[in-house]
Amino acid sequence: MFKGLRKKASALSLYSQPTRAGGMANDPSSYDKILKQVHDFETAFKAMDYLLDDRTQDGIDLLQEQQKRHVKTESQQPAAIFPLALGVMEFIEATLGFEPEVMERAHQTLSEAEAASMNNVKYNVRYSLGTSHIYPPGTEFQVTNAESTLLNALLMLLQESNGVVESAKALFKLRKAYQTLDSIYKKIKESEPVFNKNLAKLKKEASLQHEGNSANVSTVDLPGYSNQSSRGGSSASLPQDVKLLKNLETVYQMRKSRIEGTSLNDPSQALNVNMYAATSSGESSVSVASAVNSDSGGRPESPRATTLSQNAKFRNPIPSSADDEFDDEDDEFSDASDTFHSFGNLSIPHSMHKSSSLANSQVLDNAESFVSGANSSSISLRNSDQEDNHMHVSTVDEYIHSGVQLCFGILQVVLSLIPPTIGKVLSIVGFRGDRETGLKMLWRTAITSRNIHGELALLCLLVFYDGPIQFIDDGYQLPGQEDANVSEVISIDKKSNISDKELEIILKNPALYTPQLLTKVRGYFPHNALWLLQEGRMLAAQGQLVKAATLMQSFTDNPETKINMQQVEALLIFDRAMLYAFKHDYDEAARDFIYLLDINSWSKSIYLFFAGSCYLEKWRMIKLGMIEVEDREKSLKYYGDQAELYLKKAPTYVPGHGINASNKKGGIGGGNKQMPFDKFLLRKLQHIENCQKKHPKLSFLNCFGTSPIHELIYFWNGYNRMNETELKLTLTLLGYSGAVNSDYSANNNEQNFAKFEENEDEAMIRYLFQSITLRSLNRLSEGVSLLDSHVISKFVTQDSPNMPFKFIKMTYSPYLYPTALYERSMFVWLLRTSKKSANLREAIEESKSWLKKSEMVGDGDYELSNRTGMKIKAAGDRLDQFKTQI
C-alpha cells in the first residue's frame, strides 16, 4: 500500500485536504469514479489525436458522445477534461488561421474550461479521489486549469493588433498560469526520486506476475487497489472486481494504442497485450477476460503482439539488477511527502550516432518527403533495448508531467520573446521568461511524450525554428559550430528519455534534430497537411525553395488528398505563396494569394495587397527584359491592369477605413482594429497618392518607388531562404527604381525605367535590402559599405566613441531605421568572426552595441514594432547565449 501520502499538507493543493495515516488507500466506493476520470482523460487524448490527423469532426463527435453519456448518468462528478480538450482543439485552429470568429469561439470554450477545472479540483478534494500515485487529489485539474488559462492568455497575446494595454492584460493572465505551473513543476522535480522508486516497484511486481503466469491486468491507474487474484486470493471472482478489472484493462488498452500511435485505427484490429510479458515476440498474453472469468468460457490466450516503440516519460535510473534491493519486506510504495530533497539529473546519457539520410523516406498522401537528415526507420518497430516505462505510468501522472512541462516550457519561451516595446510591462507583472529553460522543456516533451502535449511541443519548436517569423536568429553562429561542421548527431526519434547534456547539444544545432521528430509524427498522423506544411517550412529554412514549393504543390494537386481543416489549407497556401514570391514566381504567388480570399478571413486587405505587389513585380520583370513573353505589350497591359486592380482594392478591406470592411472584426469580440500590415499598406498607398499629386501625368504603377514585395519578403524571412540565383535577381529588381547612375541602380544614361527622381526615403529602403542581398551573397564589404553610406548615415548624427549616440527621428518608413541598425549588428558579427584570429568576446560586445542602438531608435509603438522588436531581442538573446559558451 502507499504510506504517508498525506503526512504533510501539499503545497500544490488550493484547498485544505484531510490526512490519512497509513497512506493513500482509496475508498472502494470511489473506484468507479476514479476509473471514469481516467477513461475521460484517455478519451480526451484520443479526440485531440483526431485533430492532429485532420479529422477534427471525429474528435468533436467523440467528445460530444462522451459528454452526452456523462449527462445521462446524472452524476454529480464533473468532467472538466472535455471542455479543455475542445478548447485545445479550437485553440490550435485559431492560432493556425488567426480568424477572429475562431479565436472568439476558442476564447469562450477555454474560459468555460477554466471554471470547470476549478469545480473539478473542489470535487476531487472533497471526495478524496486519489488518481495519482504521487500527487494529492485535484492536482490534475489544477493542471487543466493552468493549461486553459495559458492558452486563453496566448490567444490574447498572439493578436498582432494588440497594443501595450492589451498585451499587459494577457501578461497578467499568464502570471496566473505561471504561478500554478511553477508550484506543480517544483513538486514534480522534488518527487522524481520517489516516482522512480515507485516505478521500480511496479516493474518488479509486473515481472513477478509474469513469471508466475498471473493475471495481466495493470492496476497502475487505480492507486491503492490490489488485484488479489495476482496474489493467490479469490476476490477477482467478485462481480465488482470483475467489473473493475475489465475497466482497468479498457483504460490500459486505450493508453497502449495511443502510445503506439494506433489509437485512431479500426478498433476491430486491436489486440490484447500482456503488459507484464517479456520483450520476446514468442511470449503469449492472457486476456483480462480469462483472468477474471477463466471458468466461464473466456477468450483463449492470444499471441502477444509486437510491442511498438514507446515514448516513456521517465526512465528508471536504477539498473535492473538493483531491483532486488526492494525486498519483500518493503513492498509498500512511497509518496511525494516522504522525500523532499534536491536531486541531480538521473538520466543516463546515450551514445551519439551518425545521422542518417532520408534516402528511403516515407511517401505520405502521395507527397514526397524531402526532409534531409531524418531517420527513415519505421516508427512501428520496437527498440528492444528500450524499457516500457510508459506503460507503468498512470494516465493521470502522465498528463500532469507532460502538461506541466509543455505549458511551463511555452510560458518561458513566450515571456522571453516579449519585444522591447512592451517588455517594460514585465517589470509590473513581476516575472521574466528563460528561453533556454523553456526550449529544453519543449524538446523533452516532444521527444518523450506520445500525446497531444508531445505533438504541441514539437509544433511550437517547428514554428520557433522554421516559422515565417524570426524568433531565433540563425545568422549568428559561433565559428565551427555551424550545422555543416557537426559530424555526429544524436538519434532521438525512439528515445524514452533525454538528459540535460543531450538537450544542450540539441539546442546548439536544432535543425539537425527537428527532422527526426517530424518524420515520426508524419507517420502517426499521415492525413494532416499541417505536418507536411512544417516539412515544407523546414526545407525552405534550408534554402531548398524548389523542393519546399513542389512538396506543397504536389499535395494540393493530388485529387486523392484532402485537407479538412480549412485553417491548415489557408496556412499551407499562404506559405506556398510566400515561397513562390521568394523564388520570383509571381504568377503562382499571386494565384495563391487570390485563392486565400475565398477560404480565409484573416485579412483580405493584405491578401489583395500581396497579390497586387506580385503582379507589379512581374510587370517590372518584363520591363527590365528579365523574362521573355510572346507579346510584350499585351503582357505588360495584363500585369499592369492586375497590379492596379488588386493594389487599389486592398485598402477598401482595411477595418475602419474601406467600404468593404464593414463586416470585418478586429480581434476577440470585434473592435474593428487594424493589424500592423493594414497600417503598412495604407501608408505605402498614401505615398503613391502623394507622388501622383506631385506628378499628375504619371500612371499609378509608375509612382511606386522600391517595390513593396521586397519589404514583404523581408518580414517573412525570405532573404535567408533564397539561393544565389534568386538573390542576384533580387539585387537587379531592387535597382528598378534607383536614381540614374546611382549605386546598384538599373538606370543609367542609356536606359531609365524610373519615371520620377528617386527621393532619399525611397533610396534608403532600396539600399537596405540591397545591402542585405549582398551580405547573403557573401559580399560583406560591399554590403556594409552600402548600408553605412546610404542608410545609417542619413539618420544617425553622432556615433563616435565616448560620445552619446544621437539620431534624427524619421517617420517616412518607421520600421526601417531600427531594422538598419539591427542588420548592421549582423554585418559586424559576420565580418569579425570570418577572421581566423577573431576575438569572439569583442565581436559579441560590438554586435550588441548596435542592437542597443537599434532599440533606442525603435523605441515606441509603431507599425510592425512587434516584429522588429522580436528580431532585435532574438539577436540579443543569441549573443548572450554565446557568452556562456566561449
UniProtKB/Swiss-Prot annotation:
Name this protein carries in UniProt: Inclusion body clearance protein IML2
Organismal lineage: Eukaryota, Fungi, Dikarya, Ascomycota, Saccharomycotina
Highest taxon of source: Eukaryota
Entry's localization field: Cytoplasm; Nucleus
Alphabetical keyword list: Cytoplasm, Nucleus, Phosphoprotein
InterPro entries for the chain: Iml2/TPR_39, TPR-like_helical_dom_sf
GO cellular component: cytosol; mitochondrial outer membrane; nucleus
Source organism: Debaryomyces hansenii (strain ATCC 36239 / CBS 767 / BCRC 21394 / JCM 1990 / NBRC 0083 / IGC 2968) (Yeast)
Ranges of compositional bias, category Polar residues: 210-219, 304-313
UniProt function note: Inclusion body (IB) resident protein that interacts strongly with lipid droplet (LD) proteins. Involved in LD-mediated IB clearing after protein folding stress, probably by enabling access to the IBs of an LD-stored soluble sterol derivative that acts as a chaperone in inclusion clearing.
Record gene name: IML2
Presence of the UniProt keyword Signal in the record: no
Family that this chain belongs to: Belongs to the IML2 family.
Main location per the UniProt record: cytoplasm
Biased composition (Acidic residues): 322-335
Low complexity: compositionally biased ranges: 224-237, 287-297
Quaternary data: Interacts with lipid droplet proteins.
Disordered: annotated span: 207-238, 287-335
